[in-house]
Regions:
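Metal-coordinating catalytic core of metallo-dependent amide/deamination hydrolases
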Residues: 2-113
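Glycine-enriched alpha-helix->loop->beta-strand junction motifs that scaffold or abut catalytic
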Residues: 3-5, 65-70, 102-105, 122-131, ...
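Catalytic beta/alpha-barrel core
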Residues: 49, 106-115, 131-137, 156
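Short acidic/histidine-rich active-site segments
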Residues: 71-78, 131-134, 138-142, 147-170, ...
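Histidine/acidic-residue-rich catalytic or RNA/ligand-binding cores of hydrolases
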Residues: 79-91, 119-121, 141-150, 160-182, ...
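C-terminal helical cap
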Residues: 129, 137-139, 177-229
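C-terminal cap of metal-dependent C-N hydrolases
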Residues: 212-269
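Intein/HINT protein-splicing elements and their conserved insertion hotspots or analogous self-processing inserts
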Residues: 258-286
Length: 286
């Protein structure tokens, strides 16, 4: 209803039992089928992580989902994921998913902090998309990924926040000696995601006459000049916080000057607070 574009999936695992897992599989596939030609919504097949997915479940998923339906999976976030896969007889978390025919060039593999040598080989061979989440990894104390071995990676937040500029700054500051020239970071932040997303939502991405007017204007007035060579520096150290002055999707203004023109923000906040209280009460009652 808000009008944003999204690529969505439901996290599938064995944690709630077989019947729930089968419902999760059905929902993922039906959502993907329903939105195959929708310019605003697309689906993927959501997987939690190797440690919560049995061999029987992965085999069932491989048989149930359309071959061309890509997966979104947490992969090698913590060392326990790598240890589990090796104990199961695989080289690592990517190798285990791959052995069930689930990895291709459209797969989204999230984290990839703890991988084996065969995992890196499969990533290179398939061109699967690796999404790094520096703030989440730091929060969970799981270590840092080997960026130099993941040349095609893009940036994410793991749902910890909705602030991608904050994630970009953390990525830069947590580099641990990695040289991060701005052109390479611009590829990670802008060009590579646009290319990847254009395969899911064709004809949407671009900044040229005739392209869909999907635009975010930051609430940032620079004191020093902005040039192509220092744009990323302004995003890292000047416009940090990611607060938008205006957001438009397909030319429709969704947010402007701290307000939703088409929605009552007070009503939305009350609904969000009510949902948050219900969730908190569920945890506290356990």
């Amino acid at each position: 209803h808000a009008g944003i574009r999204a690529i969505l999936c439901l996290e599938t695992s064995d944690r709630r039992g077989q019947k729930a897992m089968m419902r999760q599989v059905e929902e993922n596939v039906s959502f993907w089928e329903q939105h195959r030609k929708n310019p605003f919504l697309a689906g993927m097949f959501g997987l939690h992580a190797n440690i919560t997915l049995s061999a029987e479940t992965l085999s069932f998923i491989s048989r149930s989902k359309p071959k061309e339906m890509p997966i979104h999976a947490h992969c090698g976030e913590a060392s326990v994921d790598l240890d589990f896969c090796r104990a199961e007889g695989f080289a690592g978390p990517v190798d285990r998913f791959s052995s069930f025919g689930l990895i291709d060039g459209d797969s989204f593999l999230i984290h990839c902090v703890h991988l084996g040598e065969e995992d890196y080989r499969i990533l290179k061979e398939t061109g699967a998309v690796v999404v790094l989440n520096p703030e989440s990894n730091a929060n969970n104390r799981v270590g840092l990924p080997g960026r130099e071995r993941l040349p095609g990676h893009i940036l994410g937040t793991d749902g910890m926040t909705g602030d991608i500029l904050s994630a970009l700054r953390s990525y830069y500051l947590l580099g641990e000696g990695n040289k991060e020239p701005f052109p390479r970071m611009e590829d990670m932040m802008f060009r590579r995601p646009a290319k990847i997303l254009s395969r899911r939502l064709p004809g949407v991405f671009g900044f040229h006459p005739g392209a869909a007017a999907d635009i975010a204007v930051l609430d940032y007035v620079p004191l020093s000049p902005i040039r192509e060579s220092n744009l990323l520096g302004h995003l890292l150290f000047g416009a940090k916080g990611g607060r938008a002055y205006l957001t438009a999707v397909n030319g429709r203004i969704l947010w402007m000057k701290g307000e939703f023109p088409e929605h009552d923000i007070l009503t939305l906040r009350r609904e969000a607070q009510r949902s948050a209280r219900k969730l908190a009460n569920r945890f506290q009652s356990r």
